[in-house]
Structures are given as C-alpha cells and as structure tokens.
C-alpha cells in the first residue's frame, strides 16, 4: 500500500450472481482465502464484465475464522453453513467478513475512469487498496443505502 491509497478501503472484484446476492441480502458474508488488515472497514466491489465498474460499497466487520473454539456463523446467509462445516467447495476460504451495510454508487466508476482519471492500470483481478483520489471524491456515506444490519 502506498501513501496514495486508503488504509480503510479496498476494491474487490465480484462476479454475478454473487453481487446480486449481496445486494438483495441473501449473501450476508464475504468469504476470502486471506485476512484483510484490521484497519479495513469497507469493500468497494468492482463488478466484472459486462458491468466493468465499481458499483457498490459495503461496510464490513472484522474477519471471523473457523478455528477450533470459534463461534460459528449464523446460517441465515448463502455459504454460511458451508463455511461452518468446511464443505469441500470452501477449502481455504478461512475468513468470513460480515456485511454490515450495502450502498449503491449513484454514478458507478467505470473501468475507463478507473484507468484514465484514477491511474489504475487494469481491472482489479484481486484485492487492491482504494486510491485515495476515489476515497476523497466519492463520499461513500452519501451514496444510496440499500440495507444495513440492525
């Protein structure tokens, strides 16, 4: 991470149907094979083709793990039971991030803008720290809130 990147926000690529499942609340955890830094509070989701844009921002809780003695996830969301039971399709997905809120960006950030305006060389393929220029120009909390926990 450079000083031109946010220490609290990351970009993660997301394919369909998973993005729709997050937006409509059926998927209430994001599962990853790696632990994000504890300072990360929000994920800006880059929707892959055909959307090719950052369209949603989610506030997240710190990582939950599935080590012996850990409290299992509530099994109300897609993938939660599989995470808890270590289903074979969930091998190595050892970190679960509870989605606390979902915001839709009123004017999605298109790939051409990410490249031209914000200096990203290509579409995000893995996790990327959010450029500070995006964080400073897009007020995440002023976007349209779709849902929030509690």
Question: How would you label these PLM feature ranges?
Answer:
Residues 2-150:
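Structured alpha/beta reader/binder surfaces that contact nucleic acids or chromatin modification marks
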């Amino acid at each position: 991470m450079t000083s031109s990147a946010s220490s609290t926000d990351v970009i993660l690529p997301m394919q369909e149907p998973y993005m729709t499942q997050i937006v409509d609340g059926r998927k209430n955890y994001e599962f990853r094979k790696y632990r994000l830094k504890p300072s990360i509070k929000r994920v800006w989701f880059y929707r892959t083709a055909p959307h090719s844009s950052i369209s949603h921002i989610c506030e997240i809780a710190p990582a939950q793990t599935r080590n012996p003695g850990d409290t299992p996830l509530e099994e109300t969301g897609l993938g939660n039971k599989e995470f808890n039971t270590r289903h074979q399709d969930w091998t190595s997905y050892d970190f679960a991030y509870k989605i606390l809120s979902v915001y839709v960006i009123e004017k999605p950030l298109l790939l051409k803008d990410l490249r031209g305006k914000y200096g990203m060389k290509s579409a995000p393929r893995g996790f990327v720290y959010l450029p500070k220029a995006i964080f400073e120009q897009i007020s995440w909390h002023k976007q349209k809130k779709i849902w929030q926990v509690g």
